[in-house]
Regions:
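N-terminal small/glycine-rich loop or linker at the start of catalytic domains
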Residues: 1-15, 107-112, 161-195, 239-249, ...
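N-terminal beta1-alpha1-beta2 module of alpha/beta enzyme domains
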Residues: 1-63, 187-188, 298-299, 307-311
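Hydrophobic faces of well-ordered beta-strands that scaffold small-molecule active sites
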Residues: 3-7, 35-37, 66-72, 95-101, ...
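Flexible, glycine-rich active-site loops centered on histidine and acidic residues
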Residues: 6-15, 78-161, 217-218, 272
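Catalytic domains of carbohydrate-active enzymes, especially glycoside hydrolases
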Residues: 18-40, 200-213, 257-266
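Glycine-rich, proline-tolerant flexible connector loops at the mouths of alpha/beta enzymes
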Residues: 34-52, 213-220, 268-281
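C-terminal helical cap(s) of enzyme catalytic domains, especially alpha/beta-barrels
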Residues: 113-120, 131-136, 219-227, 273-296
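Long hydrophobic segments that form regular secondary structure
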Residues: 171, 178-232, 236
Length: 311
């Protein structure tokens, strides 16, 4: 059973770094796969919080195993800058980084980035699909051994192992490559959520992890449908993990029952900042008794059973 915790750090009273560091350490001690941090507040103009990737870089220095996933919008960032920032986080964390890209629009966010009226659903979907493809290919712009740093021979890199993106699409033009080395786990983990029916094929082609809404009677059918789409895209069904979103008050027994019905690969537990203490004191000990005793490796991909580089 794979377990993630997600925390919107803009909800409620702002959290200090010491609070967040303590939470990350407790989650790691319990063996959870990853923390997903969201720093956006679509309905509140008065929110204040750290920027997610910057915060996760700091949390990487006080943890050593748990995955560190930043929510980052395709509206609020240019693909080159975001790819570079997440690749840097992956290097800093020794292969534990991930990107949570939501397929849902946030009107307030769009208004802050020169799109006061947002995008139509179709345009947003096409733009997001192009954006994700650019980021993933930028991450693959250098082979693992492409950078030589050969001072004597005067060679910075092996040209045969550098791959220019040279992308010219409907919405973006990006030449590449990144000025950051290849990620320790090949590419950071891509997490998608906010999926409509039309978005599921995008997820099947590109995602490593899919977050779906709270468990329902058709959870098993949704799980099987996604896995069929993954196979239809030429991928192994295990290449995409489906986690169901649940609340912080969920009972561990209920998770175990739902997981045994083969309706998902695990769960993403959404925690309001005000509920952190209760979650650490009541829920984490129960989860710790039910998950693996230790991490199988050091990289997020190894925790999730996904193919990649350093494990």
């Amino acid at each position: 059973m794979h377990l993630a915790v997600s925390l919107n750090i803009t909800s409620g009273q702002p959290l200090g770094f010491s609070d967040l560091a303590g939470f990350a350490k407790q989650a790691e001690a319990a063996g959870l796969d990853m923390i997903v941090l969201d720093d956006s507040a679509p309905n509140s103009a008065g929110s204040s919080s750290f920027e997610a990737t910057t915060l996760l870089a700091a949390l990487a220095t006080v943890t050593s195993r748990i995955g560190l996933v930043a929510a980052a919008s395709t509206v609020a960032h240019q693909p080159y800058n975001l790819a570079r920032r997440l690749a840097s986080l992956d290097i800093i964390s020794h292969g534990r980084a991930g990107w949570h890209a939501t397929m849902a629009q946030a009107p307030r966010e769009a208004a802050n980035f020169s799109r006061p009226d947002g995008f139509s659903d179709d345009v947003f979907r096409r733009r997001t699909q192009e954006y994700i493809g650019i980021v993933q290919r930028l991450w693959q712009g250098w082979d693992a051994d492409a950078l030589l740093f050969d001072k004597i021979g005067g060679r910075f890199h092996d040209p045969e192992k550098m791959h220019l993106l040279d992308h010219k699409g409907e919405f973006f033009s990006v030449r590449g490559p990144l000025n950051v080395a290849r990620s320790p786990q090949d590419t950071p983990v891509l997490v998608l959520s906010g999926l409509s029916e039309a978005d599921l094929d995008i997820a099947a082609r590109t995602a490593d992890v899919v977050l779906l809404d709270r468990p329902t009677e058709d959870a098993k059918a949704r799980h099987d449908d996604l896995k069929r789409r993954v196979v239809a895209c030429g991928r192994d069904p295990g290449a995409v993990k489906l986690l169901l979103n649940v609340g912080a008050d969920v009972a561990a027994n209920a998770l175990e029952t739902l997981f045994s019905s083969q309706s998902c690969d695990g769960f993403n537990i959404a925690i309001p900042p005000a509920a952190i203490d209760g979650f650490i004191g009541r829920v984490l000990p129960e989860l710790q008794r039910r998950v693996r005793p230790d991490y199988p490796g050091t990289a997020l991909r190894s925790h999730l059973g996904l193919a990649g580089g350093a494990q």
